[in-house]
Each structure stands twice: as structure tokens, then as C-alpha cells.
Swiss-Prot record:
Skewed-composition ranges (Basic and acidic residues): 133-143
Name of protein: Vitronectin
Record-linked CDD domains: HX
Gene: VTN
GO cellular component: alphav-beta3 integrin-vitronectin complex; basement membrane; blood microparticle; collagen-containing extracellular matrix; endoplasmic reticulum; extracellular exosome; extracellular region; extracellular space
One Pfam family this sequence matches: Somatomedin_B
Organism field: Homo sapiens (Human)
Residues annotated as site: Cleavage: R398, A399
Length: 478
């Protein structure tokens, strides 16, 4: 027995050393560490790379102040002293407000530049991209071969949109004809619309757009038989490419596209393409690893999704985002059969951000709260500087947790919603809900991804794009 004692001591020491190496003790703020076998950063839950003691050492107490609590197209103003509106909502809504110092922050930080930036001084129409904001459109004298710009765009014309997508920094872009818009927390950002060719280096109109929800957050624009891929606003080398080369089985001249995340790093990202009365589901073969994304700014949209993995909703995420086991394109299906309440043909589509039901104020508190500010999409980094990333890459206007709505209900001038019945706001359980937006003509629909049915609200869907997304006046309020 005595000869075994030294071996036992050595084994115990080895176990202690290994446990120390694989522990999160003292590592919770170091970020991703390529030299370690397990990780202790905020995204390790998504990548399934956490050390065994991550929860005990690093995971903060679950608080619901760092998540969205409503879909982005619902925002209610609770104000006892102002005019009542006769609209009553029947969806799960409620949420934090936009802080009033955002615009001051934007003005006070001129060094925080937009993500999009030119690839070269004067790019040809299809090989570069420029900043969407902060620089003047290039004079036509720099491009004598270009056609003259089309007639001035009318914001509230009611014409259909070609595409909607949110960029990796949380900015929301809408495309219509030759022009694109950037939408902020209220309506359209100052200086827009701009010609698509002056912002993205592509001659408009485009057919569809989406941004992948992974750590890289690359944006894809589709036109005819080709597609363009951008990273941090710069066109990737060797683009444009044929759709048939990059998305086998997807037709040319698509009408719309929307992207969904993988439920975890072991899952697959999906994109839905829509054309005519049919849609196609495409699954990506790979998603970038955490190590591959260390050299670039992290997608704020993906970061919000990935950090929600810490709150033990794995089963629900699998239900929402679990795809087929094989990558590639699925056979086309009919829109009207699988997306209940959506018209048989759509012009544009976009995935909304995930919000958490069951977090709205109780009826007794609802009318005491005043939510003065509103926003369609808003993401804030929870990571600090632990990864050594450039935190200025995100738009100042989307640098804090904003309210969960677009400007739908909040942009109706003096109409206030202080007569809501709030009992429906708090369901029996608290769980994530993913919305999908479909745009058709001058109207849009919001669909619950889990049920694939149009949400029931009053006033009902479809609703006006111009009124609720662009800040145009409601009929009778001109």
C-alpha cells in the first residue's frame, strides 16, 4: 500500500493543477483566451466553451433589465394628463425607454464614425461602399459616366420598399428604388434618403438584403442574378458573385430575404428567400468561430442574442432556430400555406429582435409610467473593453438599450395610449419571442416566428409603413 501513496499524491496534484487551469477563477474579465481550453467570456454559453465553474464564478444574477421586453413595432405612451387614443393592443408589449441624451452623445462624440466607409477614393459603381452618414454625397463631376440621379424621392409616397435589413452595429436600413434610408429611434435619420450607389456602391434598385446574425455580421445585397457581401461596410474581395454560386438552388431576382441565427454554435444559420408566391429555406454550412472574429468588431445584434443564452433558454432557442441537419437549400414552399395571415407575395422581409415576454408593467403601474422615447432596434454592448475591440464601431444612436418598439404607436403626434388594458402583458411564463416583419405594398405585417401567424393587435395588421416606420403623419393628422 505504501508504494501507491506517492502515486496517489501525484495524481491529486495533477488533478488540482488541471482544475486550476480549467477554472474561471480570476478570468471572468479577460475575454476570449485562445490559449485556454475552456472560456470565461460572455459568449462562451453560445459557443458551448465555458469552463465548468463559469456559472459559479462569472455569471451575474439574472436581471431582466438587459433584455428587450416588447417587439420593436409596439410602443405605448402612458400619460394620464394627455389625450386618449382609442386603440387597444392585444400583444405582449412593454419596455424601457430611450435615454434622452442619445442625440447629445452623438453630437458630442464626433470621433465615432459610422461603420460604412469607402473602399477607395472614388469607387466604381459595383466595387466599393461609402459611409452612410458623415460625408457628403460625391459630386457627379467625379463620375462623368454615371447617369444623372433620378427624381427626388418622396418619403411618404406610399411606394413599396425593396428591402429592409439591420447592420451589425444595429443600424436599420430600408431600400426603395434608387434610394436607401437609415432609420433611427424616431423615423428617418437626417440626410436621408441617399442614392444607394453613393452609400453602397451599387446602382439601385436592389431586390433583397439581409445581415447574418453571427459574430461577423456580414451584410448581403441581392440584385438580379448577383449578390454583394459587405463586412464593416466594405465590399469583400471577389464580389459580386452569382447567386447560383453562393446559394445553390436559390432563384435569381428574389423579392425578399430574412436571416435567422443558429440556436447555438452547434446549430446552423438560416435564410429565407421569397419570390412570387413561394419561399426557399437556405442553411449555411458553417458559421465563424469565436477565434475567427477576434480581429473584427463584434456584431451588436449577435451579441444581444448570444448573451441571452446565459439565461437558460436553450430549449426555446432550439425550438425557434433549430434547422435541418443538412446544409443547403430546401425545396420551395408556398408563403400563404406556412406564414398564416401574410399575403401570398411580399416585397421585403426582416427578422425583428428577440424580446422577452412577461416583463411588462402591471396594470396598477402602467398609467404612471411615461415612455417618451422610442426606437425600432437598439443594442448595447455588455462587454466593456474585455476583448480589446473598437467600441466606436457602433452607432451612437444605438449605443444603449432602447425601447422595444419601432415608432409605430409613438409617432402618432399627440395621440397617447393611456387607456391600455395591461392584463394581457404578463403571461404565465417569461420566455423569448422572435418576430418577423413582412412588407407588402404600403403595408406591413408582424409574425410570431414560433406560431408563424400574424400577431393580433388593434388596430390590426396590416399597418402603414409610412406612418409607423417612416414617421409620416397618420391620416387626419396632417
Amino acid at each position: 500500500m505504501a508504494p501507491l501513496r506517492p502515486l496517489l499524491i501525484l495524481a491529486l496534484l495533477a488533478w488540482v493543477a488541471l482544475a486550476d487551469q480549467e477554472s474561471c477563477k480570476g478570468r471572468c474579465t479577460e475575454g476570449f483566451n485562445v490559449d485556454k481550453k475552456c472560456q470565461c467570456d460572455e459568449l462562451c454559453s453560445y459557443y458551448q466553451s465555458c469552463c465548468t465553474d463559469y456559472t459559479a464564478e462569472c455569471k451575474p444574477q439574472v436581471t431582466r433589465g438587459d433584455v428587450f421586453t416588447m417587439p420593436e413595432d409596439e410602443y405605448t405612451v402612458y400619460d394620464d394628463g394627455e389625450e386618449k387614443n382609442n386603440a387597444t393592443v392585444h400583444e405582449q408589449v412593454g419596455g424601457p425607454s430611450l435615454t434622452s441624451d442619445l442625440q447629445a452623445q452623438s453630437k458630442g462624440n464626433p470621433e465615432q464614425t459610422p461603420v460604412l466607409k469607402p473602399e477607395e477614393e472614388a469607387p466604381a459603381p459595383e466595387v466599393g461602399a461609402s459611409k452612410p452618414e458623415g460625408i457628403d454625397s460625391r459630386p457627379e463631376t467625379l463620375h462623368p459616366g454615371r447617369p444623372q440621379p433620378p427624381a427626388e424621392e418622396e418619403l411618404c409616397s406610399g411606394k413599396p420598399f425593396d428591402a429592409f435589413t439591420d447592420l451589425k452595429n444595429g443600424s436599420l436600413f430600408a431600400f426603395r428604388g434608387q434610394y436607401c434610408y437609415e432609420l433611427d429611434e424616431k423615423a428617418v435619420r437626417p440626410g436621408y434618403p441617399k442614392l444607394i450607389r453613393d452609400v453602397w456602391g451599387i446602382e439601385g434598385p436592389i431586390d433583397a438584403a439581409f445581415t447574418r446574425i453571427n459574430c461577423q455580421g456580414k451584410t448581403y445585397l441581392f440584385k438580379g442574378s448577383q449578390y454583394w457581401r459587405f463586412e464593416d461596410g466594405v465590399l469583400d474581395p471577389d464580389y459580386p458573385r452569382n447567386i447560383s454560386d453562393g446559394f445553390d438552388g436559390i432563384p435569381d431576382n428574389v423579392d425578399a430575404a430574412l436571416a435567422l441565427p443558429a440556436h447555438s454554435y452547434s446549430g446552423r444559420e438560416r435564410v429565407y428567400f421569397f419570390k412570387g408566391k413561394q419561399y426557399w429555406e437556405y442553411q449555411f454550412q458553417h458559421q465563424p468561430s469565436q477565434e475567427e472574429c477576434e480581429g473584427s468588431s463584434l456584431s451588436a445584434v449577435f451579441e444581444h442574442f448570444a448573451m441571452m443564452q446565459r439565461d437558460s433558454w436553450e430549449d426555446i432557442f432550439e425550438l425557434l432556430f433549430w434547422g435541418r441537419t443538412s446544409a443547403g437549400t430546401r425545396q420551395p414552399q408556398f408563403i400563404s400555406r406556412d406564414w398564416h395571415g401574410v399575403p401570398g407575395q411580399v416585397d421585403a422581409a426582416m427578422a425583428g429582435r428577440i424580446y422577452i415576454s412577461g416583463m411588462a408593467p402591471r396594470p396598477s403601474l402602467a398609467k404612471k409610467q411615461r415612455f417618451r422615447h422610442r426606437n425600432r432596434k437598439g443594442y448595447r454592448s455588455q462587454r466593456g473593453h474585455s476583448r480589446g475591440r473598437n467600441q466606436n464601431s457602433r452607432r451612437p444612436s444605438r449605443a444603449t438599450w432602447l425601447s422595444l418598439f419601432s415608432s409605430e404607436e409613438s409617432n402618432l403626434g399627440a395621440n397617447n395610449y393611456d387607456d391600455y388594458r395591461m392584463d394581457w402583458l404578463v403571461p404565465a411564463t417569461c420566455e423569448p419571442i422572435q418576430s418577423v416583419f413582412f412588407f407588402s405594398g404600403d403595408k406591413y405585417y408582424r409574425v410570431n416566428l414560433r406560431t408563424r401567424r400574424v400577431d393580433t393587435v388593434d388596430p390590426p395588421y396590416p399597418r402603414s409603413i409610412a406612418q409607423y416606420w417612416l414617421g409620416c403623419p397618420a391620416p387626419g393628422h396632417l
